[in-house]
Amino acid sequence: MVDHKKLSFLIVLFLFSINLIVWQVVFSLNEQDSLEITFFDIGQGDSIFIETPYKSQILIDGGPNSTILEKLVEEMPFWDKTIDLIILTHPEADHMSGLLNVLESYNVKRILWTGIIRDTAQYKKWREMIEKENAEIIIAHSSQEIKIGDVSLNILYPLESLEGKEFKDSNNTSIVCRLSFKNNSFLFTGDATKVSENKIIAKTDCDSDVLKVGHHGSKTSTSREFLENVSPDIAVISCGRDNPYKHPHEQVLKNLEELGINILRTDQDGDIKIVSNGNYLIINN
């Protein structure tokens, strides 16, 4: 015999669930006025998630492990399993390992990286996975521009293609890119050292509102000259709590403080979200 009360309840529950999903989609599609950039608290590594006003998603690096998957679930709708662009700044484990997990779990449309050669097991796994992904592969070099709606991503480094070249230390091959949205700009530096910084500022005005500090705040990066050229209002340092490298270095912090730059750190502040309407920035952490 049919239990009409139970059947009615199940129908109402089903309709409510469908209605909730529809409204989530509607609200998601209508939020087209702000850029959101989240610097993940990913441990001793880097991972930055960017969502454009029209909901295109960019992931710069993936951190050292599968924690990135937990972070993405917090930022992306449960039905969305596509990332528009992944950027691997350089193939070191603390930037690359998490991307292997991402490639297993998400469809990726485009991959931007340097194409350099390294002799590590993780690197070989990376090459195998991106070849199977069926994504558009872009080899980074300066003067490239990637446009996504109102958002522009300009590649500042490396100055020329490094594809097919082998490096034991890949920090100085890191992709450095500047993202612009109307009147706001963000500079992402990977693990670029002072050597790369000097080459960049010799060619380019890097003025930006927000700087992702190079190499987790190591003394190898973020020279005073570079900071004066970038002239950021905000500096974000991505590093792990009580990390064995003692990042960030006290001299880097001193340089930032003396120049009056607001410092945010993932080891102290957790996930750091910066929202831009193209003119103003709001910090959530």
List each model region and its residues.
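Non-globular, low-confidence helical/coil segments that flank catalytic cores
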Residues: 2-285
